[in-house]
């Protein structure tokens, strides 16, 4: 009997520890859910009184309540994943993730809002408020999430970390490659997914049949020569937002690529499931959601592939030789 009780006790203790751990994580995510909801609503209050009043939006894919639930869950999941997979801790982690989150979720998206919608549905006053809207979730929620998830203490990392360490020449050609890749994904997804929607073409002032791809591209370069340089700038901002994630990641490059892909695609596009007077046509929102979620996810994964370490040769880059 004594032997049985000795072998049984560790199993019971392990089971109890597992139950305690489960409820601890449930309580943590419940707290994070509540905090993000409150701060998201606080940020949204910046738009009070400046949204278009003469534009009626078509209904979203889901109700406002369900949409808010989805937005909160998606953002909490992505931010928590970035925090928990980082080798960093304390303010280094909080500031790094906060800046990356604001840059990728608010800044890089709203400069595109300025470029395309400032002459359609977005006033200069509203544009400023859109930039302010993202501040609470980035610079208040992220540090709080670091604390709630138990990463508030700085821990010195003595393990080797080759992420982002490469010669200047390699940085130059990789950033050039990243820019070309982003232009290809942006323009390809934009034309073959979003631009095939006649309601979207009409919304942006080009009703009727779509032009063939190369004619459409040439016409865009002729009439809007700033578009491609502007998108190259956005590509570099995307990369800047990915650097703290790549450098701080303690998981393997495949998982890091998945995380950055989700980070680039989920928080920015989940809002398209709701009604939106800035994009009042439901099919336009859906087209943009599919277009940008697909292209930015792929782009995020490629950024990690190119930048996570130095590559000695093209074979090394393609995984055909040992690093």
Task: Walk through the language-model features, giving the residues of each.
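Juxtamembrane/disordered regions of integral membrane proteins
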Residues: 12-321
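N-terminal amphipathic/basic-hydrophobic helices that include classical n-h-c signal peptides
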Residues: 1-15
């Amino acid at each position: 009997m004594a032997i049985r009780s000795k072998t049984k006790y560790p199993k019971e203790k392990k089971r109890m520890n597992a139950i305690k751990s489960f409820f601890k994580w449930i309580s943590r995510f419940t707290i994070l859910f509540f905090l993000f909801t409150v701060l998201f609503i606080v940020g949204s209050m910046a738009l009070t009184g400046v949204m278009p009043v003469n534009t009626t939006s078509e209904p979203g894919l889901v109700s406002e309540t369900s949409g808010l639930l989805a937005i909160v869950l998606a953002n909490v999941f992505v931010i928590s994943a970035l925090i928990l997979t980082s080798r960093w801790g304390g303010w280094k982690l909080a500031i790094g993730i906060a800046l990356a989150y604001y840059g990728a979720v608010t800044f890089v998206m709203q400069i595109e809002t300025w470029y395309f919608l400032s002459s359609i549905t977005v006033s200069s006053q509203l544009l400023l408020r859109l930039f302010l809207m993202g501040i609470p979730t980035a610079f208040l929620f992220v540090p709080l999430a670091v604390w709630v998830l138990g990463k508030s203490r700085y821990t010195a990392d003595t393990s080797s970390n080759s992420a982002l360490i490469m010669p200047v020449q390699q940085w130059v050609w990789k950033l050039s490659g990243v820019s070309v890749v982003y232009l290809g994904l942006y323009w390809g997804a934009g034309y073959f997914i979003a631009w095939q929607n006649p309601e979207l073409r009409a919304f942006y002032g080009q009703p009727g049949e779509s032009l063939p791809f190369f004619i459409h591209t040439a016409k865009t370069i002729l009439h809007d020569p700033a578009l491609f340089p502007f998108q190259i700038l956005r590509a570099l901002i995307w990369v800047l937002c990915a650097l703290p994630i790549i450098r701080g990641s303690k998981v393997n490059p495949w998982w890091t690529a998945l995380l950055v892909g989700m980070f680039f695609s989920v928080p920015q596009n989940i809002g398209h499931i709701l009604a939106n007077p800035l994009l009042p046509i439901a099919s336009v929102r859906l087209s943009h959601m599919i277009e940008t979620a697909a292209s930015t996810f792929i782009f995020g994964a490629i950024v990690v592939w190119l930048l996570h370490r130095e590559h000695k040769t093209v074979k090394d880059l393609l995984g055909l030789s040992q690093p």
